[in-house]
Structure formats: C-alpha cells, structure tokens
Amino acid sequence: MSKSQTEGIFGRAVGNLYRGGPANVSWEQALEGLEAGDAERTPNHLPHSAAQLVAHVQFWQAHLLDTLAGKQPATPEHAADGWPAPDDWETLRATFLRDAATLRDHARDPELCAALNREGVPHAAILTSYAGHSVYHLGQVVAVRQALGLWPPPGGGDTW
C-alpha cells in the first residue's frame, strides 16, 4: 500500500469520527429534529442536557481549531471552565456542526495531519484525541435523547 493510500485511509477513519461512520451515528443524526426546549431538558437521572453536552464539545472544538491555526488558546484551569452555558440552541447547533465539518476536513488533510504543534506532537494525534472526546459525548447525547423518549430522531438512527 502506498503512502498516499495509507494517508487516505487514515484521513477517512479519523474524519468519520467527527461526522459518524460505521460504528456510530453522525452528530447530524443525533441532533436532527431536536428542538431548543428538548435540547435544554436534563433527564432526572443524568447530569447534562443535550445542549450542555454540545456546548462542552463545541468549546473544545473551537479550542482545537485555534490550536491548529497556530494560536495558543488558554487551557481551562478547572474542568468546569470547559462547560460553558449553552447559547441559543439553533446558533449553537449550527456552529457546532460547521466546526465539526471543518475538523473532519482537517483530519483528511495529510499535510495538516503531519504538521507538528509547538510541543512536537503531530496534528494527527491531536485530532484523533479530540475525535475520541467528541464521540464519547455523542453517545451521551444519544442517551439523553433516549431518556427523554426522543430517540430515534426523525430520520432514523441505531436503536441499540
């Protein structure tokens, strides 16, 4: 297998973590049909609403995009600082999905993935780590929707 083929396979695999793939629904599917009132509801036995989870992941997506752009965003001193209050749901969802698509495209860019950050870590490693974080919380959003009786979404989704 050529280097180009390997890079393409890696890029698709990591890119799919940001948009969904064979092992999970996409963020678009998970958020489909979720209205603001429901997105802001927290089931009694769960710690977060879907909107809170999306705001948290968006915080880190924005942090990663700044990092990849060569900026040095501050890392929160405390975990709670990475959980901003959700803004307007429609705006949050649109911004979140736009940034997830940008990260997917970055993950599919061999030159960007090979580039090193200031600490000498390849961007591919950082993108993969953040993708794992995103998918973890994607599962939580699905669990919140299930607990609220809002799963599967209108367009369908895995029910197990």
Please state what every model-predicted region is.
Residues M1-N24, E28-L31, A36-A80, N117-W160:
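Short, contiguous alpha-helical
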Residues W83-S134:
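Acidic/histidine-rich alpha-helical segments that form the ligand environment
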